């Protein structure tokens, strides 16, 4: 039988045997949780709503539930136990803030048996999830529960200012006392939905010291990998559109500063990656439908509970990376370096660790043996900075240009048309050079040709100019035909010049694929190869 000691150590037992935590079976713990929460939340509904006061954060209510029952409590087949509720009015406010009604809260936790999860970390805690996937119930140590109590006033203030956060959302703190043993539990939001298979799950701290999943962890059906595993598997990171990346990093930065202000460290980002694949989706769609049928009440939805809502809110879908119509189930659309379409589910976990004396000592001796900047235990400010840097540079990356903006498209079209115009001008110059060579052989000078055609002497002190960016941009918007025409006035002058020797064509037409460029001789911009060549203007 698997067991967990007072210090959180897990003792391996035979397969299929029920786990125990502090000498109490998991079934007894689950039953006590459901009975205790059912009584306290139901009793709380009779109390009138009012503003939360400072003393409300330190209130502890207690009720005794004997196995034979009492005037206030039902009979049950578990050992006698006492159930404590910490700050009931404050947590009622938190639940209301996230849109959780008392009936929905009771339905999720008490209507169906709680589902026990395999331990995803090394904390030795037991994890239960409600049948509708809304809530996670986790056992915590005495110091963690005590720290959460002290954290509540600041936590209350932060949630009031910003309910959209990746920090854990605490909905209740309770304690089961039985046989002289205290089992403290906390109810939180569920970060990873069971309805979707997580192809990869990572626990990321931004540290490299011993941050690789153990062999035992890798043998699990759903292993949780660590930082070094991520750098090996996803060495190019995960890619988001610009808006989603900005919202995600702003949320992480704000959350880290909140944790730093409370001197909290050693937290992690729990990251679940679901690879979107048509074959996988079809199979998972059937299984998730079977798993959820009849177990979730219509209309219940915890506000700000999904990863996408936590960073952006319901008004922004951020689905430019995943272009096809997909039910994201609250996941954040992203792409891998291989171009795979992904849904990401994430949340910051394990925040009930303050930088106390033991942590300072732990970092000190680790820093003597290893690089102090690589170990996970560090002072809160440095830990937050390293965590953010790792997330921004190694994990989450921005797709540079999923969709070209109008200004970029205009610049690209101008560049392409300029290059095309250079080729056209070169061809026209070569043709006119041949024509002029014929004129020279018949005795007509270039200087007179320049005077008649251009109406002025050549100016060696003038440097040929190229179109300005403003001219090019304005000309690009006037493109409407698909041919190149030589100005009629210039043709008329040429006809008069060459009437005695050689007749010029009435027009010269050059076909482009997408655009047209008009060349005239009255505006000087581009010069041909010869010093005496005519000066041309390029209009887009």
Swiss-Prot record:
What reaction does this enzyme carry out catalytically?
a 1,2-diacyl-sn-glycero-3-phospho-(1D-myo-inositol 4-phosphate) + ATP = a 1,2-diacyl-sn-glycero-3-phospho-(1D-myo-inositol-4,5-bisphosphate) + ADP + H(+); 1-octadecanoyl-2-(5Z,8Z,11Z,14Z)-eicosatetraenoyl-sn-glycero-3-phospho-1D-myo-inositol 4-phosphate + ATP = 1-octadecanoyl-2-(5Z,8Z,11Z,14Z)-eicosatetraenoyl-sn-glycero-3-phospho-1D-myo-inositol 4,5-bisphosphate + ADP + H(+); 1-octadecanoyl-2-(9Z)-octadecenoyl-sn-glycero-3-phospho-1D-myo-inositol 4-phosphate + ATP = 1-octadecanoyl-2-(9Z)-octadecenoyl-sn-glycero-3-phospho-1D-myo-inositol 4,5-bisphosphate + ADP + H(+); 1-octadecanoyl-2-(9Z)-octadecenoyl-sn-glycero-3-phospho-1D-myo-inositol + ATP = 1-octadecanoyl-2-(9Z)-octadecenoyl-sn-glycero-3-phospho-1D-myo-inositol 5-phosphate + ADP + H(+)
Q: PROSITE patterns per the record?
A: PIPK
Q: Which InterPro entries match?
A: PInositol-4-P-4/5-kinase_C_sf, PInositol-4-P-4/5-kinase_core, PInositol-4-P-5-kinase_N, PInositol-4/5-P-5/4-kinase
Region (Disordered) residue ranges read: 1-23
Q: What is the lineage of its organism?
A: Eukaryota, Metazoa, Chordata, Craniata, Vertebrata
Q: Which GO terms describe its biological process?
A: phosphatidylinositol phosphate biosynthetic process
Organism per entry = Gallus gallus (Chicken)
Q: Where in the cell is it found?
A: Cytoplasm, Cytosol; Cell membrane; Endomembrane system
**Principal subcellular localization:** cytoplasm
- The protein in question is named Phosphatidylinositol 4-phosphate 5-kinase type-1 beta
Which residues, if any, are the signal sequence?
Answer: none
GO molecular function ontology, one term from the record: ATP binding
Q: What does this protein do?
A: Catalyzes the phosphorylation of phosphatidylinositol 4-phosphate (PtdIns(4)P/PI4P) to form phosphatidylinositol 4,5-bisphosphate (PtdIns(4,5)P2/PIP2), a lipid second messenger that regulates several cellular processes such as signal transduction, vesicle trafficking, actin cytoskeleton dynamics, cell adhesion, and cell motility. PtdIns(4,5)P2 can directly act as a second messenger or can be utilized as a precursor to generate other second messengers: inositol 1,4,5-trisphosphate (IP3), diacylglycerol (DAG) or phosphatidylinositol-3,4,5-trisphosphate (PtdIns(3,4,5)P3/PIP3).
Residue ranges of the PIPK domain?
25-395
Which SMART domains does UniProt cross-reference here?
PIPKc (SM00330)
Which Gene Ontology CC terms are recorded? cytosol; endomembrane system; plasma membrane
SUPFAM superfamilies given for it?
A: SAICAR synthase-like
Which of the seven top EC classes does this enzyme belong to? Answer: transferase
Q: Which Pfam families does this one have?
A: PIP5K
Record EC number: 2.7.1.68
Record key words, sorted: ATP-binding, Cell membrane, Cytoplasm, Kinase, Lipid metabolism, Membrane, Nucleotide-binding, Transferase
């Amino acid at each position: 039988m698997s067991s967990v000691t007072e210090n959180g150590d897990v003792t391996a037992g035979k397969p299929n045997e029920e786990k125990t935590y502090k000498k109490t079976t998991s079934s007894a713990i689950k039953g006590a949780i459901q009975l205790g929460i059912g009584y306290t939340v139901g009793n709380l509904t009779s109390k009138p709503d009012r503003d939360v006061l400072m003393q409300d954060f330190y209130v502890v209510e207690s009720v005794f539930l004997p196995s034979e029952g009492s005037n206030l409590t039902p009979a049950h087949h578990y050992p006698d136990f006492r159930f404590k509720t910490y700050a009931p009015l404050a947590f009622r406010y938190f639940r209301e803030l996230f849109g959780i009604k008392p009936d929905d809260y009771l339905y999720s936790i008490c209507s169906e048996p709680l589902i026990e999860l395999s331990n995803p970390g090394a904390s030795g805690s037991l994890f239960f999830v409600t049948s509708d996937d809304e809530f996670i119930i986790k056992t915590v140590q005495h110091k963690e529960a005590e720290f959460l109590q002290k954290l509540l006033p600041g936590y209350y203030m932060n949630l009031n200012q910003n309910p959209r956060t990746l920090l854990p959302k605490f909905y209740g703190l309770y304690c089961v006392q039985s046989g002289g043993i205290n089992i403290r539990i906390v109810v939180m939001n569920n970060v990873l939905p069971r309805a979707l298979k997580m192809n990869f799950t990572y626990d990321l701290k931004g540290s490299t010291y011993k941050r690789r999943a153990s062999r035992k962890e890798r043998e699990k059906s759903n292993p949780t990998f660590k930082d070094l595993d991520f750098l090996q598997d996803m060495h190019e990171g995960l890619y988001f559109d610009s808006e989603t990346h900005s919202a995600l990093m702003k949320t992480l930065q704000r959350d880290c500063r909140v944790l730093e202000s409370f001197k909290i460290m050693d937290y992690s980002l729990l990251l679940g990656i679901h690879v979107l694949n048509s074959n996988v989706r079809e199979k998972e769609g059937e299984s998730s439908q079977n798993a959820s049928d009849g177990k979730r009440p219509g209309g219940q939805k915890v506000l700000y509970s999904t990863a996408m809502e936590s960073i952006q809110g319901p008004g922004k879908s951020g689905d430019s990376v995943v272009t096809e119509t997909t039910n994201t189930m609250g996941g954040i659309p992203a792409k891998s370096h291989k171009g795979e379409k992904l849904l990401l589910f994430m949340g910051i976990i394990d925040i009930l660790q303050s930088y106390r004396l033991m942590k300072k000592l732990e970092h000190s001796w680790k820093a003597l043996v290893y690089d102090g900047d690589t170990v996970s235990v560090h002072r809160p400010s440095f830990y937050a900075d390293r965590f953010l840097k790792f997330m921004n540079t190694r994990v989450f990356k921005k797709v540079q240009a999923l969709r070209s903006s109008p200004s970029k498209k205009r610049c690209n079209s101008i560049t392409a048309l300029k290059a095309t115009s250079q080729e056209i001008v070169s061809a026209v110059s070569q043709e006119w050079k041949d024509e002029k060579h014929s004129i020279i052989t018949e005795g007509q000078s270039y200087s007179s040709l320049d005077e008649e055609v251009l109406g002025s002497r050549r100016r060696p002190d003038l440097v040929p100019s190229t179109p300005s960016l403003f001219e090019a941009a304005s000309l690009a918007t006037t493109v409407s035909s698909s041919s190149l025409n030589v100005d009629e006035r210039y043709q008329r002058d040429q006809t008069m010049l060459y009437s005695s020797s050689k007749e010029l064509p009435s027009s010269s037409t050059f076909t482009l694929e997408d655009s047209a460029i008009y060349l005239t001789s009255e505006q000087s911009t581009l010069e041909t190869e010869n010093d005496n060549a005519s000066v041309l203007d390029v209009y887009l």
